């Protein structure tokens, strides 16, 4: 799969590369989050250093819980996927961007996202969200047949991110909406299971960062600051 000239990435000899998706550090809102330690690669230095994270970030997401499992080798058809979703939560996919920048090639984040994921304490059922159902964005090119479903499958959910500095007042950093998501929850579940992967009741799936089309609607500091190039007023 890889170019023989670059068979090993520079981080291969420094980190036991892996990809991490885990439930052990999913915590409820209000649980303290400790700044993670890890390897970071500073500019103009040949080797990484072990350090506390210097670029701790949030990711504004939602998540959904599987309510009705599917068996191994029995994929969930996209048109019936919503019937297997119990409900939604708010989700903050905490991210250590400097750890992530060093470790993510070639498999993706590992320690950069494993230290905490915060979810809201209440699950909102899809029945309760029915009045907010709306049409999802147009998908071009048309998805492959296993990812197709008829009708509206997005939800008009207004979302905000506020940051309160110690001793200060909350400042709103972003305003966005769940309806901007390109892929629906039904498509996400259908794709997750299409290979035959089984799910269990209680499995949690995150939406990915929810960002809108305009500045001020981006769901992470990475995007809001253009990776540190643009200040954000707090």
Where are these regions (language model features)?
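Active-site pocket scaffolds in enzymes
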Residues: 183-191, 198-201, 205-234
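Active-/binding-site microenvironments in catalytic and ligand-binding cores
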Residues: 81-82, 167, 173-175, 208, ...
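Secondary-structure transition/capping motifs at alpha-helix termini
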Residues: 168-169, 195-199
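Active-site microenvironments in enzyme catalytic cores
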Residues: 1-174, 183-186
């Amino acid at each position: 799969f890889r170019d023989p000239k670059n068979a090993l990435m520079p981080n291969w000899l420094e980190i036991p590369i892996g990809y991490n998706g885990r439930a052990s550090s999913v915590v409820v809102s209000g649980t303290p989050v400790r700044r993670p330690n890890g390897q970071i690669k500073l500019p103009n230095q040949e080797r990484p250093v072990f350090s506390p994270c210097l670029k701790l970030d949030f990711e504004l997401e939602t998540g959904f819980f599987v309510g009705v499992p599917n068996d191994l080798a029995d994929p969930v058809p996209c048109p019936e996927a919503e019937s297997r979703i119990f409900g939604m939560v708010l989700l903050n996919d905490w991210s250590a961007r400097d750890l992530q920048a060093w470790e993510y090639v070639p498999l993706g984040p590992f320690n950069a996202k494993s230290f905490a994921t915060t979810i809201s304490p209440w699950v909102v059922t899809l029945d309760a969200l029915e009045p907010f159902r709306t049409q999802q964005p147009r998908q071009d090119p048309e998805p492959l047949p296993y990812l197709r479903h008829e009708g509206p499958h997005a939800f008009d959910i207004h979302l905000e991110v506020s940051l309160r500095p110690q001793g200060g007042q909350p400042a709103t950093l972003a305003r966005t909406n769940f309806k901007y998501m390109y892929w629906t929850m039904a498509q996400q579940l259908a794709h997750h299971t299409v290979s035959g992967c089984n799910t269990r009741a209680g499995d949690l799936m995150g939406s990915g960062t929810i960002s809108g089309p305009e500045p001020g609607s981006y769901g992470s500091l990475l995007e809001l600051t253009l990776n540190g190039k643009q200040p954000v007023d707090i």
